[in-house]
Amino acid sequence: KSTLCLALCRFIEPFAGDIAIDGVSILKVGLADLRDRITVVPQDPALFEHTLRFNLDPDGKASDAEIMELIHKAALTNLVQRDPLGLDAMVHVKGGNLSSGEKQLICICRAILRKKKIVVMDEATANIDVQTEKTIHDLIKTEFRSSTVLTVAHRLNT
């Protein structure tokens, strides 16, 4: 399953068969162009030693209002409220000051804010509690309605 995700992003080249997007082989699409169409939410969240705002929106394209609305929808309000710096609170190295579920939620929010055509979710909700997971699945259905979402999961309900 994860190999398919790696091949889709061209981190590895398929040795047989083909992967096509809109009928065009990914091997015929420039690597930068291909990766510009895709966002990945990995099983092991990739976070930066930087502010919460930067981790949510490293491109700096979203307004604070957009970020806060998404934080509310993604059940991350407590994370922002527990630090007086709010969105400017620092995330430690590898998100050491966050729970594994919070890390995954941040990466899901980042993917939503990026608004890419293809979303790869590799065990993206594995560390989120059942109640929040339902909220996130509803959010994913709404926010990615115009995207193709490839989900890799061990649990059937994810």
Functional labels for PLM-detected ranges:
Residues 20, 28, 53-93, 137-138, ...:
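ABC ATPase nucleotide-binding domain helical subdomain, centered on the C-loop/LSGGQ "ABC signature"
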Residues 113-117, 146:
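A short, proline-enriched helix->beta-strand linker immediately N-terminal to the Walker B motif
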Residues 119-123:
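Catalytic Walker B motif of ABC-type/P-loop ATPase nucleotide-binding domains
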Residues 8-9:
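Helix-to-loop junction immediately C-terminal to a conserved catalytic motif
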Residues 17-24, 34:
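Conserved ABC transporter NBD signature motif
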Residues 3, 99-100, 106-111, 135, ...:
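ABC ATPase nucleotide-binding domain "signature" region
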Residues 133-145, 157:
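Helical segment within the ABC ATPase nucleotide-binding domain
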Residues 146-153:
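Conserved H-loop
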